[in-house]
């Protein structure tokens, strides 16, 4: 697995892209080829691998990315601000309201967040992750909630978002600690209301409507862990448009960030939905092009190439367009029950050393802050 292509795009995009608002010609002259050079090195290593495998004549190679990359632009969507404007989320007043415990939690959380921001760029992700584990779980959970929702009045909140992704949760009675929305009809009607109204959000500076669609979670996902997903998933023009409203006090739930706000961000490139899929080998159609491939199609395709049956419950399908006609034959499907799985799941445990290794790997990839 290669992670350098991800990291370099996040941190060097502004030097590579003349249309980026923070593009500087002098900096570009020094760092502008950094992304290209990383890809060149990856290409050379892939070439070396193919040279070794070509002699065998029976090996297929798939090059896959889980997403693409693009400019982290000035567009911003503040979901909690929009929810508040619809009367669906309440904020605590800024005049000292709230219990003493709430005030102390908020002060502690803000102090922790300021400390984390001052450490980013100075200390490795792995070290920060180890420091976090020194804190009691209960304290981390409480401060984490305050970091995401420092000003939310839960008694007047029917829906909310952590604002870092296109996710909306319903403050459901019986599930959430201070839930006020009744399961059943009230829950369904509230989701319907948000689905109908949110795509009408307009950025007044550009006239654009950045929300493409709002999905119910069961429209996109299924399985025994569906309840862990947000109640609604918001699809926008770009996945990086969702931003915490933070210190922004204006009325615009969709807006353009000013240069000073953009300059505060360490990353200048972000993910895009379209990644890459490149296939090479004796079973592949030379010069073929795929128009409707998705990431979930990779696993069933690999299983088929290995001569293994594909579970009927698995998402995705075999990318037959990429295969020679003779390689498409012999496609087999099988139920999980036939494979011996009863649907109850498998209990997996790690030693402390294994768990530490997994955490460090995830931190090194940037998934743990």
Task: Indicate where each model-derived feature is located.
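Active-site regions of oxyanion-processing enzymes, predominantly non-cytosolic
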Residues: 1-17, 234
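A conserved hydrophobic secondary-structure block that centers on an alpha-helix together
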Residues: 5-7, 37-40, 45-47
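Aromatic- and acidic-residue-enriched carbohydrate-binding clefts of CAZyme catalytic domains
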Residues: 16-33
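Low-complexity, glycine/alanine/valine/leucine- and proline-rich hydrophobic stretches
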Residues: 237-240, 244-299, 304-306
């Amino acid at each position: 697995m290669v992670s350098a292509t991800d990291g370099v795009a996040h941190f060097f995009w502004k030097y590579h892209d003349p249309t980026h608002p923070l593009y500087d010609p002098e900096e570009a002259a020094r760092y502008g080829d950094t992304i290209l050079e990383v890809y060149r090195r990856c290409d050379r290593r892939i070439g070396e691998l193919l040279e070794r495998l070509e002699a065998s004549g029976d090996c297929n190679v798939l090059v896959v990315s889980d997403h693409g990359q693009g400019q982290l632009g000035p567009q911003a969507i503040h979901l909690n601000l929009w929810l508040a404007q619809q009367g669906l989320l309440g904020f605590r007043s800024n005049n000292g309201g709230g219990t003493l415990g709430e005030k102390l939690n908020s002060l502690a959380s803000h102090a922790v967040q300021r400390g984390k921001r001052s450490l980013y760029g100075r200390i490795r992700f792995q070290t920060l992750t180890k420091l976090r584990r020194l804190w009691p779980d209960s304290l981390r959970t409480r401060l984490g909630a305050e970091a995401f929702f420092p000003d939310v009045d839960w008694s007047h909140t029917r829906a909310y978002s952590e604002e870092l992704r296109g996710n909306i949760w319903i403050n459901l009675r019986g599930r959430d600690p201070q839930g006020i929305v009744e399961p059943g009809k009230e829950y369904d009607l509230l989701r319907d209301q948000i689905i109908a109204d949110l795509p009408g959000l307009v950025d007044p500076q550009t006239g654009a409507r950045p929300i493409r669609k709002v999905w119910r979670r069961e429209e996109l996902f299924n399985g025994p862990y569906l309840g862990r997903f947000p109640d609604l998933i918001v699809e926008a023009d770009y996945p990086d448009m969702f931003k915490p409203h933070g210190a922004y006090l204006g009325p615009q739930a969709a807006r353009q960030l000013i240069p000073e706000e953009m300059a505060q961000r360490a990353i200048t490139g972000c993910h895009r939905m379209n990644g890459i899929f490149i296939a090479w080998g004796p079973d592949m159609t030379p010069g073929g092009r795929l128009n409707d491939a998705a990431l979930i199609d990779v696993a069933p395709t690999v299983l088929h190439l290995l001569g293994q049956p594909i579970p009927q419950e698995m998402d995705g399908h075999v990318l037959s367009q990429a295969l020679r006609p003779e390689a498409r034959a012999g496609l087999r499907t099988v139920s999980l029950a036939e494979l011996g799985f009863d649907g109850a799941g498998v209990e997996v445990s790690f030693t402390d050393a294994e768990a530490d290794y997994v955490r460090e790997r995830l931190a090194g990839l940037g998934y743990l802050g």
